[in-house]
Amino acid sequence: MNNFRWFWFFIKSRINWILWILFLNIILLGVAYIDYEISVESVFYIVILNVGLSILFLLFTFVKEVRLSKHFYEDKEIEEIKHKDLAETPFQQQVIDYLYRHIAAQKEKVVEQQLQIKNHEQTITEFVHDIKTPVTAMKLLIDQENDDQRKRALLFEWSRINEMLDKQLYLTRLETHHRDMYFDYISLKRMVIDEIQVTRHISQAKGIGFELDFKDEQKVYTDVKWCRMMIRQVLSNSLKYSDNSTINLSGYNIEGHVVLKIKDYGRGISKRDLPRIFDRGFTSTTDRNDTASSGMGLYLVQSVKEQLGIEVKVDSIVGKGTTFYFIFPQQNEIIERMSKVTRLSF
């Protein structure tokens, strides 16, 4: 904001005083004009001097008081404003003291809440890691099961438990995921195959197969752990809402970007629900009896995609299936985005 606009705001804030001074000077001229014993010319000179000195006083006051307003406008910290002692009037000092006390109290509350959240996240993380041990042991026991039908049923439920634990772990790490990323060129086909292996017990139990169409040399510049998490959430949704069908996964290039396409032939998503599928906790409005979904999987995808620079698009037709597109960035785009984040952090 330029100085002229600041001066205009200052004048508007002092308009009552300015009008009062002008009113008094007009009264003085009027009295001199009515009373013949008073020299109008002398009074006029006094009025001119009075107005001139008032203008100088306004300019002097503006220069002193505008500094505080500029610091507020520039969102300076209240500690900096108080340290510089910018208050020019007792009223301004009262305002600064009030803001300082209340902002300091709010900051203490924020720090306390952040500590509570951190402790809560640490507790959940430790719980998930602790429960992973018996879950892993359970897998070893299931592998020793001789009854194939019973074994498949147990592996199906074990896979669901393992997936829910992983999802909870990712949700807990979500606030600090930007500090837990390492970008490198990764084989897209390898990541997809690894995630299919993780979900194979669920797909086998539901009679779902996979068709892959990738080039071996097709690589993407990303963080392998968080990218695999995104792929897993979409695959999990496709498996959850499909039966006895096929999921097509393919990779292709378009305008210099690698695109991962995941297409299922499940129940699909209605147009009404499509804009909301990435909202936290959102579940389908078409089947209110469905309790299988927590509404957190695609929320994870939405929360991480920006840090990875991945654009996600969705097409769906109810009763015919859903298609997800992951459009991966180029390396220079990731570096540029990370440099912007670094500059903002300083």
UniProtKB/Swiss-Prot annotation:
Top EC category: transferase
Keywords: Antibiotic resistance, ATP-binding, Cell membrane, Kinase, Membrane, Nucleotide-binding, Phosphoprotein, Transferase, Transmembrane, Transmembrane helix, Two-component regulatory system, Virulence
Positions carrying Phosphohistidine: H129
The reaction(s) this protein catalyses: ATP + protein L-histidine = ADP + protein N-phospho-L-histidine
Domain (Histidine kinase) ranges: 126-332
SUPFAM superfamilies in alphabetical order: ATPase domain of HSP90 chaperone/DNA topoisomerase II/histidine kinase
Location of this chain's protein in the cell: Cell membrane
Parts of the chain that traverse the membrane: 15-35, 43-63
UniProt EC number: 2.7.13.3
MF terms (GO), sorted A to Z: ATP binding; phosphoprotein phosphatase activity; phosphorelay sensor kinase activity
SMART domains found in the cross-reference section: HATPase_c
BP GO annotations: cellular response to phosphate starvation; response to antibiotic
CC annotations in GO: plasma membrane
Topology term for the membrane: Multi-pass membrane protein
Maturation and modification: Autophosphorylated.
Function: Member of the two-component regulatory system GraR/GraS involved in resistance against cationic antimicrobial peptides (CAMPs). GraS probably functions as a sensor protein kinase which is autophosphorylated at a histidine residue and transfers its phosphate group to GraR.
Protein name as annotated: Sensor histidine kinase GraS
Origin organism lineage: Bacteria, Bacillati, Bacillota, Bacilli, Bacillales
